[in-house]
A protein has these predicted regions:
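Non-catalytic nucleic-acid substrate-recognition regions in nucleic-acid-modifying enzymes
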Residues: 1-24
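Soluble or luminal CAZymes and related metallo-dependent hydrolases
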Residues: 2, 6, 41, 54, ...
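Proline-centered flexible-loop/turn and helix-kink motifs
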Residues: 16-19, 129, 155, 203
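Conserved AdoMet
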Residues: 25-96
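Proline-centered helix-kink/hinge sites
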Residues: 58, 82, 183-184, 203
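Conserved SAM/SAH cofactor-binding pocket of Class I
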Residues: 88-193
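Mobile active-site "lid"/loop adjacent to the S-adenosyl-L-methionine
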Residues: 184-216
Length: 217
């Protein structure tokens, strides 16, 4: 079973639901997975993946994998799938790190609010070996994923993960040099216009702003 065979099969099964470009991209995800399976199990696995895709389950959740810059991170339905815009933000911050002033010399103390998979602080720690981060989230399940990602990337000794609701804080820690966040900002009234793969499968806690206030954070 090669890439062309996989693409032909998923095109037949998914053509009414996805564009040609999407089907082609799915093939590059699925091929390595199928190649690692015994021949007799490959078609069964392919059928299972196609059924999940037809249910609009994001392929990142099917494989519990998201690519974020040079990093391969774990994602689950407890965490938002990292967006390209977030990657661009991380790249911009990392490029401008020389202009960030710190009271600790070259050591930057960062804080990420609503860390989810941990993609933002882990990316920044990966690119800036002298930085340290505290990352908070209200979701214990999301923090478990972030901990796995930090260990996998090798930055676990420079990140502290805390379960906390930022909206209940009275003030920010005094030793923070850099504050980053990608908080929920979508109002519930916008849900009707959202794609099923987002609305039905990504965590509403990370999508919809509390009290329908996009500026609450």
């Amino acid at each position: 079973m090669n890439l062309q065979m996989i693409q032909a099969h998923i095109q037949q099964r998914l053509q009414p639901h996805f564009s040609a470009d999407e089907i082609k991209a799915f093939g590059f995800w699925i091929l390595p997975h199928c190649e690692d399976l015994p021949e007799n199990d490959r078609m069964r696995a392919l059928e299972m993946i196609c059924e999940q895709l037809k249910q609009q389950i994001p392929i990142q959740y099917i494989f519990e994998t998201a690519f974020f810059g040079p990093l391969t991170l774990k994602v689950t339905p407890a965490t938002l799938i990292p967006r390209p815009e977030t990657e661009e933000l991380c790249h911009l911050i990392s490029q401008k790190n020389k202009s960030i002033e710190s009271s600790n010399g070259p050591i930057i103390e960062g804080l990420d609010i609503g860390t989810g998979s941990g993609c933002i602080p882990i990316y920044l720690l990966h690119h800036n070996p002298q930085w340290k981060f505290t990352a908070v989230d209200v979701s214990e399940d999301a923090l478990d994923v972030a901990a796995e990602n930090a260990f996998h990337v090798g930055v676990h000794d420079r990140i502290q993960l805390n379960q906390s609701n930022f909206l209940e804080w009275e003030s920010l820690p005094h030793n923070i040099d850099l504050l980053v966040s990608n908080p929920p900002y979508i109002e519930l009234k916008e849900a009707k216009d959202m794609a099923d793969n987002v609305l039905k499968h990504e965590p509403h806690l990370a999508l919809f702003t509390p009290k329908n206030d996009p500026l609450i954070f």
